[in-house]
Amino acid sequence: MALLQISEPGLSAAPHQRRLAVGIDLGTTHSLVATVRSGQAETLMDSEERYLLPSVVRYHEKGPEIGWLARQQAAYDPANTISSVKRMMGRSLADIQQRYPNLPYQFQASENGLPLINTATGLVDPIQVSSDILKSLVQRAEETLDGKLDGVVITVPAYFDDAQRQGTKDAARLAGLHVLRLLNEPTAAAIAYGLDSGQEGVIAVYDLGGGTFDVSILRLSRGVFEVLATGGDTALGGDDFDLILADWIREQAGIGSRDDHSLQRQLLDMATQVKIALSDADIAEINIAGWQGKITRCEFEALITPLIKRTLLASRRALKDAEVSADEVLQVVMVGGSTRVPLVRHRVGEFFGREPLTSIDPDKVVAVGASIQADILVGNKPDSDMLLLDVIPLSLGLETMGGLVEKIIPRNTTIPVAKAQEFTTFKDGQSAMSIHVVQGERELVSDCRSLARFTLRGIPPLPAGGAHIRVTFQVDADGLLNVSALEKSTGVEAFIQVKPSYGLSDEEIARMIKDSMANAQEDINARQLAEQKVEAARVLESVTSALEKDADLLNEQEQAAIDAAVETLITSVQGNDPEIIENAIKQLDKQTQEFAARRMDSSIRRALAGHSVDEI
């Protein structure tokens, strides 16, 4: 089945009319655009027959320069030449400056704390920079295909959160594009290989690009791609190989520091050339700033080994999350230019126990997969049997009384997905309910990540437990979360789309998962205590209300017994023993059973007053 078989608004559904769609790999270091022509996916080249476009934009008086020309000027005009902007997408300025303290740009914060970069043409943000890169790719595509595009599929790292995905969508809209879908990069690579081979089983996608590392464990079964688990590092890639090599060259040559941005750019360019050379040769020459030297492949491999180990640790975590062993992995797909490094291929093959797949150019494979998906989504392949199922990396839920987390969608649930659950009011006459959306694996809200808050108002003032509120969590195909709350009797509804103000790194995700495992028993104990305290508060609220209304139904001895049980429960709640609280609740319940029966009788008598038996 095709993911989409309906016509887009304004588009003809005529079967003979082929629509123009492309897949775009919006990368940290380089970007590409690909399309399907005559049944074959191909990357589109520029006028000089280059398929890669450096993800670099230089802003100067005459307007933005994009790609190769901008990259050439980076060493001479670093403050106005923006590169690796993907790392800034969806992050706050404070987060960026903490993660990347040596960036040569003049930053200032927007009203909501997001980064603005001061350039020769004024202030720009990461969305604007990404939009300019997209415009260049679209211009290439439309000139090559001789027509306007009907839609695009843009790839993003699997670990991009809501804010980063939304920023990518905003950049595309700013470029005037109709986004058919955002697609995880590893999933796009699986399309590129999986459709051709038709093999079934578990595959691993190892994606080491310029600025991000992603690993995905997928299962191919009867044409369905299901992502079992994802992992990675949003701040690790070939750029880091270049950086560590540039530092080595600087140390060997005894020149400058990272604060010399012009020299730093020259060093990084030289490091890139050396890295590429060492993929084929055992030794590489270095000539920079009047210094000449050499580096062997063994020396280079010693420098990058710690970085490769980090990728393999993330791969091991992903396998554990997917509940599969390395032996069960039938294929390993290599993605990203950095996988050309011989040591990377060797260590990955050693880790998974099999030779990784490299038959499709690792620079092109993501764009190729995206173009195949775009061709399907735009309606050119209505008979395709391919279906994609991505997953969410962390559980989504909301806060309940006592600071507890009620998980609505557990982590690694395939998306798109929608799940609903009913909740009720805690107090008599409650007319509003605060909805606090959280993300994480722990049992208490204080240990999870807050995503958003909103309030449902207009709840009818009924007794506690009388109103019924249906809360729905819906995650779309792009991983964006929509939460709605509906009061069933009145139809009153509140809604929010979750857009975190800054990104969540994979290190934080891994830490949150690890913490949930390490604190599992402690969390269970804390939850049990919190649940008993919530129940105690409910019982005390109910008993207090009943005494205020009908204390005259009790004699002094009965009143004293109930008061004593109430005091015992209040005292127990101040402690931290759930069993003591539970026993105090039971004791109060026992003391109030006769009182409850009398209240029921009294209520019935009042209801029947003035009515004859015949009327009843």
UniProtKB/Swiss-Prot annotation:
Keywords: ATP-binding, Chaperone, Nucleotide-binding
Keyword Nucleotide-binding (UniProt): yes
Top-level taxon: Bacteria
Keyword tRNA-binding: no
InterPro entries reported in the protein's UniProt record: ATPase_NBD, Heat_shock_70_CS, HscA_NBD, HSP70_C_sf, HSP70_peptide-bd_sf, Hsp_70_fam, ISC_FeS_clus_asmbl_HscA
Any one GO BP annotation for this protein: iron-sulfur cluster assembly
Record GO terms (molecular function): ATP binding; ATP hydrolysis activity; ATP-dependent protein folding chaperone; unfolded protein binding
Any Pfam family the entry gives: HSP70
HAMAP family given in the database record: HscA
Its job: Chaperone involved in the maturation of iron-sulfur cluster-containing proteins. Has a low intrinsic ATPase activity which is markedly stimulated by HscB. Involved in the maturation of IscU.
Family: Belongs to the heat shock protein 70 family.
Protein name, as recorded: Chaperone protein HscA
Taxonomic path: Bacteria, Pseudomonadati, Pseudomonadota, Gammaproteobacteria, Enterobacterales
